[in-house]
Amino acid sequence: MGIHHDHLLPTPGRVVKFCTESEGKSPRKKARLRMWTRRNFLKRCVGIPLSGFILCSWGVISTSWAKAKKSLPQGFPKEQLIQMNPADIDNRNLEIDPFDKFGTTGATDITIDLKTYRLKVTGKVDQPLSLSLDQITKLPSTTQIVLLICPGVFVNNGCWTGVSLKTLLQEARTKTGAQFLDIKGAQEKVTRIPLKGLQEKKILLAYRVNEATLPRKHGFPLRLVLEDHYGSEWVKYVDEIVVS
């Protein structure tokens, strides 16, 4: 499934910037403050449980704690989840839903010919891309557990594997001044994503879910997985990324 290839948006080896409240303090007080912040950071990094029947990588823990999400316990009622905003939910304790229980809306019967299929990356890039699915699956992969909510209808907590947008943008070499990505799919469906803050989200183009090839009704060959956004923005049958 490529679980060992966890290259999601935050780059590996990223340096975490600790609290700077010690500026202007004495050397002894500075040392105590640095110790306190490191200890508290480590407390946040350990003890993350793995739930469900699949071992998935959680990627790099975000250093932005300003907007705390609500941590939900294992077994939290689905009838309550479907009324919630995914941007407010910490889903790390929730079970992985069996794939045969996944709900879906929108187009479900579009057939893609892999012989001619290409994912294009165009717009403000130095190196436009036109990639087959085989070429895409050979790029560094990432596996992430992300919650999909169709408000009032269904909720899917899935383990998604694919290529991160960051990886694709590195291949295409985004030009200075670029601000947005337009993710396009079948039936002219488009979702716009700001480049600012892209590295702090779990965002990828998935070709597998719960260790299985992404089925046609869920957007094969590529589906946008977009943390903190409702399922209506998770474009299916993705075939183009336009940088603007």
Residue ranges and their predicted role:
Residues P49, I61:
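Iron-sulfur (Fe-S) cluster-binding modules
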Residues L33-K43, S62-T63, K69:
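Twin-arginine (Tat) signal peptide motif
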Residues M1-N40, L50, I54-C56:
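N-terminal secretory signal peptides
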Residues V46:
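Short, locally clustered residues in the helix-turn-helix/winged-helix DNA-binding domain
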Residues W65-S244:
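Structured, non-membrane catalytic/scaffold regions adjacent to prosthetic-group chemistry
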Residues A31-R32, F41, D126, V155:
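Short, flexible active-site loop motifs that bind/organize anionic cofactors or intermediates
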